[in-house]
Amino acid sequence: MKVCITHREIFYHLLHAVFQACEKKPVIAELGVLRGENALKLYNALAPEKMVLIDSWSPAANDAYSPFDPLPAWVEPVDSYAYYYGGPMDDPATWDALYQECLSKFVEMDNVTAIRADTISAIEQIQPITGIDKFDLVYIDANHQYEYILRDLMYYQDLVADDGFILLNDCCHSHLGTKQNLGVLEALSSFLKRSDFIPLAVTNTDWSDVILVRKNSIMVKLVDMALTNSDIPFVEIPHQLISAAKVIRGQQRVNISFA
């Protein structure tokens, strides 16, 4: 696994080059879309044949933030992040506004479909609405709590083509992540034991992104070649160390430690 000193957007362009080498226009999906900002970056970088955006855009998403009442002392209340969402977290109008903001970004893209549903309910809608059976890339950025992210990984692996990718957002342990009750890294650690996916690369950043692919896929070699021949600095470590990843914050920048 390559620990790359870069940002997630560079990964998108790297994978675009890999898809181009395979003469493929990828079919892609994003789970957890919010305003559509990252989805638009994915679209512009990957030039997909089709794209599916899946999000409930619903205050019901708050229900899974934590099973405990009162919250543990180390977890901040979900309402603490209302500023990021543009309004009260329990107000449907906040989510309706986010949904409309997202749609406005893709109004001229007729190959983009938005499905307003939670990630699991959306599965049975994908094929009837879009005709898509398999994705070449699924970006997972929906509910970040352990049980939910593990469920998304377990279900959506079956919708990923044999040589397809899963990209996972916010996959690190950090002080800020703990405040949000993130369980992404822990879910990935469990998923790797239950599947044939392996991590190929991770960004050396807070809120790290990870590229996953099946261990016997040709994409293991192609991504390795693409990174090795790029100008992206990296160090390589055994992928089994991914579960030890934690953010170390210094005065100048953050780094990922596996010690």
What is the predicted role of each segment?
Residues K2, Y12, H16-A259:
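S-adenosylmethionine/decaboxylated-SAM
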Residues H7-F11:
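N-terminal pre-P-loop "Q-motif" helix
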